[in-house]
Design a protein with these regions (language model features):
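Short beta-strand micro-motifs enriched in acidic
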Residues: 9-13
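Amphipathic, hydrophobic secondary-structure cores in small proteins
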Residues: 14-50
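Short, surface-exposed charged micro-motifs
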Residues: 5-7, 17
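Short, charged, surface-exposed hinge/linker loops at domain edges
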Residues: 1-5, 37-71
C-alpha cells in the first residue's frame, strides 16, 4: 500500500477527528500536532502484524464546513 488518506474534521471544541477512507482506522487529537502523532500511532498499531502492508505515506485531508449568512 503506497498511501492512506484520512478525512479530518474539526470538532466544536476545537479538537480534530481523523477517519481513514480505506481502512477501519479512526483517531482524534486536541491539537493538529497531537492529531498527526495519533494518526501515525494508529496506523502503526493497525498494521503491527503486517509490516509489509504499512503505507509509504499518510495524507491528511482537512474538511471544513462553514455557513455564511446571506443577509
Amino acid at each position: 500500500m503506497s498511501e492512506l488518506i484520512f478525512e479530518i474534521s474539526q470538532e466544536a471544541d476545537g479538537g480534530f477527528v481523523a477517519e481513514c477512507l480505506t481502512e477501519s482506522i479512526v483517531t482524534e487529537g486536541n491539537t493538529w500536532d497531537e492529531l498527526r502523532c495519533n494518526v501515525r500511532e494508529a496506523v502503526r498499531g493497525y498494521f503491527f502484524d503486517q509490516p509489509s502492508k504499512q503505507p509509504q505515506a499518510i495524507r491528511l485531508h482537512l474538511v471544513r464546513d462553514e455557513v455564511l449568512a446571506t443577509a
